[in-house]
Amino acid sequence: AITSSTVSDGDTSNDSSIALTFTSSEATSNFAVGDISVSGGSLSNFSASSSTVYTATFTPSSDGSTTVDVNAGVFTDGASNGNIAASQFNWTYDSTSPTMAITSSTVSDGDTSNDSSIALTFTSSEATNNFAVGDISVSGGSLSNFAASSSTVYTATFTPSGEGSTTIDIESSKFTDNAGNNNSAASQFNWTYDNTAVTVSSFTLSDTALKVGDTATVTLVFSEAVTGFSSDDDITVQNASLTTMSTSDNITWTGTLTPSSSVEDASNILSLATTYTDLGGNAGPSVTTANYSIETIRPSVSSFVLVDTDLDAGETTTVTLVFSEAVTGFSSGDDITVQNGSLTTMSSSDNITWTGTF
């Protein structure tokens, strides 16, 4: 019979070696260490305590299953009868510390969200029977509903105590595997709880009176980084076009507004929809810019006449130029070409009707 004072047959432990005893049913004088077959380790310190009892030390070569066996016919009793095969002794050597992985089906490690609680799963690399909720360290909240799904899987609910960073952790040497090895420290699980809605700090145009050839820089500043925002989809533009807004930090976004041609409208706004959120999933408000005006209808000439069109030497006539609306930048000396005469500088009281003498 093969027995051990250190472990029982079929056990798993982290003993660096085990003491073995080989007990014969009757006296034998030729049982030797070479009659013993082993796997997963080696024997040492073999000795006879009596003609029926022998001892040895078994040292495993590495983690895993080991066997100690005595085959049939390897020794004899005093009557020269060969032995029958012994019942094999089995032992598993495990010196590896168990590890625990912390995951969540609600969020990923490092995420930010507005979930009021998250589901946690603790998965051990091997079976343990003494892992408890008290082995888990948390900050920024509390655990509830702790339960074992199996000898390797445990679940719990984490509820944040307020907005901000939270951590879930398992320090080393909090529980053991079935071999008695203390666990190694888990990789910390981090989650940020955010249930405050993002706001719009400003939504402005660099120019609110746009004419032909003008453009304006549109600047949209959120209170925090946002996700899911696209100016092409989320901003409604009146009587103009807006380039796709860009950002370097997901907080401040800029684009260029170009007024549409042939438009005269004093009342225009940009409108922001509510389809964007902050990183926690909180939706922001709908806002608009201040009013901007557009005047891109080019002025036309209503009339350009001379009072007298049949002039003799020494005669003069009044020249009248009437625009469709007030103009700026007009100078008769620069803008009117005169043939066979001279034109005084034309003047106007309303920038619409201009007169001069030819």
What are these regions (language model features)?
Residues A1-F358:
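Non-catalytic beta-sheet/beta-sandwich ligand-binding modules that flank or precede catalytic cores
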